[in-house]
Amino acid sequence: MFEALAARPQIARSLAAHLRDLSDSGTVPARTKELVALMVGWLNACEYCTCVHEEIALSLGVDEATLSTLGDFATSPQFSDAERAALAATVALTREPRALPPAVSQALRANYDDGEIVEILAIIGANNYVSRLSNSLGLRPEPKSARS
């Protein structure tokens, strides 16, 4: 992605720094952050984002069974209540970014503190930006052989 942004290096640098900060800081588990990022990519039909975040999730120990039930997170036993709340917020805000439905907001508050909620919302927002930018730039995932 950052190669595609080479015509504007400052944008590439600031975006990379922001994504790194979201990934490396805070108290929301890395697994949850990656599931949220993956869900955003999936909802926005961003092949590039989905591929990248599937690989990261797998590297964090998320198994294929969990990834295959992401679309059914609300009922799948593969996800904790906290993950379900974060994923419900992801779906709600990716589809309708103006406000969280009260039930989704309540689920977030039942599972996360205020700082963690800000973290989750920032991850949702950043990944929506990245997926839309990636789609607009026409980015596609590289074949696995090219990434090795």
Which residues make up each language-model segment?
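Hydrophobic alpha-helical segments
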Residues: 1-148
